[in-house]
Amino acid sequence: LLCLQKYSPGRETSQTCLAGENICFKKWKKGEKTSRXGCAVTCPKXK
């Protein structure tokens, strides 16, 4: 099953990941054009 998680580090970003896997999202700094990548907690199983 796939789970959808929304992250809003200034912008609403949604990424899909397999249950039990780690998903990565990009963090945008204000005034900077660089993006930092981070790993979120594993996707919740079920549902």
From Swiss-Prot:
Q: In which tissues is it expressed?
A: Expressed by the venom gland.
Q: Which CDD domains match?
A: TFP_snake_toxin (cd00206)
Disulfide bond annotation, renumbered to this chain = 3-24, 17-39
Q: Where in the cell is it found?
A: Secreted
Q: Which residues form a coiled coil?
A: none
Which top-rank group of organisms is this from? Eukaryota
Which InterPro entries is this protein grouped with? Snake_3FTx, Snake_toxin-like_sf, Toxin_cobra-type
Key words of the record: Disulfide bond, Secreted, Toxin
Could you state one GO cellular component term attached to this entry? extracellular region
MF-aspect GO terms = toxin activity
UniProt lists the family membership as follows: Belongs to the three-finger toxin family. Short-chain subfamily. Orphan group III sub-subfamily.
What is the name of the protein in this document? Answer: Short neurotoxin D2A
